[in-house]
């Protein structure tokens, strides 16, 4: 069992890292039998002006790439963590994609030398994100963690599920075209979205699984099981306002795990810790024991 704290962000174009890593955290995790894979991202750091780092520029240069990798490895050694997890979601074009893959190659070699598990987080593969090169990742990484959520997200033009059962199935099968099954870890959501339609305006807010019951009561929503998505679907109207929710709960979570049983996979992950009801871990345990 692994916990992956969001500890590291690229903080300037020299390859510096902002770090929240703590050796004491790793020690406590180890006492509980957990491995710690520190997450390195390209989007959580904003400078004083509210700007993100131009990570593409960092990856484009051998010098700054090496500096970034050195900083990651030094931070890993200092806190004693067990693995490095790369979560880069701002790789915007083919050229940046090639530099990103080269960064993964170089970092993977250093991780292997240091005895660290190396994993990469990815969105579900479609024609518009091929620059992430899953086939190459399947060679380089120990694990490719496919984020089988945000099927509908904050910027979506229509309301819908965060993670329907067909979306999970597609994520597994499409990723499996590029990555060996035993390297694929499927990440499921511990959260759901409440969608609010007022006239032509559509907005949504993400809520933890544990917050669903309060929302159902607050908006007086009724729900029914929807076979198509493998979820309970809830809605209510208040005057001209429509409230909708494709509920992520233990029932929908179990449907996804049951589908995953049909494939030889590397494991299951979830975003994020603290959003889940206690029973989620029992379902995961059953899945792993099968």
Positions of PLM-derived features:
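Catalytic domains of carbohydrate-active enzymes, especially glycoside hydrolases
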Residues: 1-13, 71-84, 255-268
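Hydrophobic faces of well-ordered beta-strands that scaffold small-molecule active sites
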Residues: 2-5, 36-40, 84-86, 118-120, ...
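Short, acidic/polar
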Residues: 60-78, 126-135, 247-261
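Short acidic, glycine/proline-enriched helix-loop-strand junctions
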Residues: 31-33, 95-102, 109, 113-116, ...
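Glycan-recognition patch characteristic of GH18 chitinases/ENGases
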Residues: 1-71
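Substrate-binding surface in catalytic domains of secreted glycosidases
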Residues: 12-18, 70, 98-218
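Acidic/aromatic/glycine-rich contiguous surface patches that form carbohydrate-binding/processing clefts
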Residues: 256-290
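Glycan-binding loop/region signatures in secreted carbohydrate-active enzymes
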Residues: 46-47, 52-54, 190-256, 288-290
């Amino acid at each position: 069992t692994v916990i992956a704290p969001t500890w590291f962000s690229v903080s300037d174009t020299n390859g510096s890292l902002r770090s929240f890593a703590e050796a004491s955290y790793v020690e406590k995790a180890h006492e509980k039998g957990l491995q710690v894979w520190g997450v390195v991202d390209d989007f959580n750091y904003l400078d004083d002006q509210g700007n993100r780092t131009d990570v593409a520029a960092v990856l484009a240069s051998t010098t700054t790439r090496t500096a970034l990798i050195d900083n990651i490895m030094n931070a890993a050694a200092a806190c004693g963590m067990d693995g490095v997890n790369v979560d880069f979601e701002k790789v915007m074009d083919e050229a940046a994609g090639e530099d990103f893959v080269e960064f993964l190659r170089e970092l993977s070699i250093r991780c292997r030398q240091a005895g660290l598990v190396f994993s990469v987080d990815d969105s579900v593969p479609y024609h518009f994100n091929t620059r992430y090169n899953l086939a190459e990742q399947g060679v380089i990484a120990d694990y490719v963690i496919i984020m089988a959520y945000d099927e509908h997200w904050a910027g979506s033009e229509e309301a819908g599920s965060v993670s329907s059962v067909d979306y999970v199935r597609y994520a597994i099968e499409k990723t499996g075209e590029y990555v060996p099954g035993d390297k694929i870890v499927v990440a499921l959501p511990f959260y759901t979205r409440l969608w609010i339609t007022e006239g032509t305006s559509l907005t949504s807010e993400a809520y933890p699984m544990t917050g669903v019951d309060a929302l159902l009561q607050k908006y007086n929503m009724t729900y029914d099981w929807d076979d198509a998505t493998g979820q309970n679907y809830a809605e209510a109207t208040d005057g001209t306002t429509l409230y909708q929710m494709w509920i992520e709960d233990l029932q929908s979570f179990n449907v996804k795990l049951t589908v995953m049983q049909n494939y030889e996979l590397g494991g299951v992950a979830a975003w994020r810790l603290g959003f889940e009801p206690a029973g989620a871990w029992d379902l995961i345990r059953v899945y792993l024991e099968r």
